[in-house]
Each structure stands twice: as structure tokens, then as C-alpha cells.
Amino acid sequence: MASWEKEKELAHLHQPEDDPLPDLSLLLDMDQFEPTEGPDSNPGAEKIYLQLQVAPGDPSEKTYKFGYEDKEAQNPDLKMRNWVPDPEKMSKWACARLILCGLYNAKKAKELLKMDYDIHWEQSKEDSQYFEIEYHCKMCMTVIHEPMPVSYDKKTGLWIKMGPLRGDIGSVVHTCRRHYERCMSALPSSGEPLKPRVRANPVRRYREKSLIVADRPKRSRWGVAPREQPNTSSGDAMALMPGPCGPFNMDPPGCLLERVPGSEPGTSEMALAMSGGPFWEQVYRDSISGPPTGPSEN
């Protein structure tokens, strides 16, 4: 068989996504190479030899290099991991602090920074406008996910939260503090570290929460839910309004004492009525007008 016929048979081994080969003759007689030969003498094993070398650096940086770098090279508008909006004016150090100040107040952001977590942000798969934050523990490599997504506002140059539902979504500060204290106090262990509870995608979870909050009935100004009767015996809302019998008046409730006999302060009838009545005073010999007169065992 001629050499060109052999090359034609071996052409199906070369895939379009592979590196272009200047000459298919390199694929001829590949089975004759010894497995112990180095990359210089074996052209087919050079690429595998480079991949098997242990690259120095942080594991998260390796993940970015082999998992995100190719995707970003294919689409220049796609910024997936640790995206810095303006590299000329901002660094990753400053960008992480602006993200924390957008998520929390300055006191909580300072607390998160003092705990020395590796902060990473990744573009959301649900909506490319938002980014999801991760806190990587340096002592046990545990990953804690931030429940609130953030987005970058190009007009103001700030990172902002997805919405105002911080109370419904929850905070990650307490979880990070508890995990940090546990790692600092625990002895070194070879076992697998404790993982936080797995939550749903932050963007999708926030949208579902916003629908629940939108359907929730809002309370009125005076503390009564709409379309509900006030909690009074007669069903009259007068007790919730400002007036002589309402809770917003500082005057003595004279209208409540009109039906009490001898309602003037300091009278014996008033003292008897407030002490429990004649039966109470007759049996227990107790009255607010003076000390109890009965024995202690009664």
C-alpha cells in the first residue's frame, strides 16, 4: 500500500477540534514507538506529557484556567469567573471589597474580610447579568455560597444586590463565622469536612421568593391587615383610632370608669371594685386600701 493510501486511512483519527497537523505522516507507525520514550522522540505523547505535569498554584486558579478560560476566549463578552469590570481602575482586591459592601453594611463586610475567606464570583447560569458569590475556606477547602446574587451597574460603577429581600433570603455572615470558629478550634483531621446545606440556585431562589412576598398581604398603617376585621369585641375599629379610648391618648380613660360605681379615685367603692369585689375581701381579707388582715396560710 502506498504511503498516501495509509495517510487517507488514518485521516479519520484527526478530529476538527484537534490541533492542525502539518503532515499526517506523524500518525504513521505510531504503534512502533516505545511507551518509555520521552516527548522529544515521541511527537504523539508530547501533549499528554504536558497535561500530566502538575501545575503549581491554587486549585481554584487551575479550575479557572482549564474550565473558564477557553469559554471566555470563544466569547469575548462572556465574563464567567472573578470578573473585574475595569482592570485599569480596579483590581480583584478592590473588586471583592466593593462586592461585600454591596451585599452588606461596612461592619459585616469587615467581619467577613477578617475571617480571611477566598472570595470568588461566577456568572450565573440562570441570568448572565448576575454573579453568584462563593466563600472558600483556606483551612478545609469548604465552599459557602452567598444566597444573594449581585450585578454590576456600569453607570455608577458599583456592585448592587439583586433586590431588597435580604431578610427573606438570609445572610451568610453567621454561617461563615460559625464555620470559621469551628475550623480554628478543631484539631487537624484527615476526614472529609462538613459541608453547608445545599441551596437552590441563588437567582432562581430569589425570583421565587419575590413572587411569594408579592402575594403576601401587606399590613395597614394602624396595624390591621387589609380585608380583615379588627380584633375587638364589638367589631368596631374605634379602639384603633386616636381618641379618648384609643391607645394613642395619654389622658386618663374616664370613659371606662363611668359605669363603675364610685369611680372617683380614692373612694372605698373604687378600692373595693379594683381589689376583687366584696367576696374577695370577705374570704381573703385582702384589699388595696391596706395590708392583708388574714392569716398567711389563707
UniProtKB/Swiss-Prot annotation:
Residues 1-17 have a biased composition (Basic and acidic residues). InterPro entries: Foamy_BEL (IPR004956). One of its GO terms (biological process) is positive regulation of DNA-templated transcription. It comes from the Viruses. GO terms for cellular component: host cell nucleus. Residues 1-46 are annotated as: Disordered. GO terms for molecular function: DNA binding. Its main location: host cell. Homodimer or homomultimer. Forms complexes with the host nuclear factors NFIA, NFIB, NFIC or NFIX. This is Protein Bel-1. It comes from Simian foamy virus type 3 (strain LK3) (SFVagm). The lineage of its organism: Viruses, Riboviria, Pararnavirae, Artverviricota, Revtraviricetes. The gene is bel1.
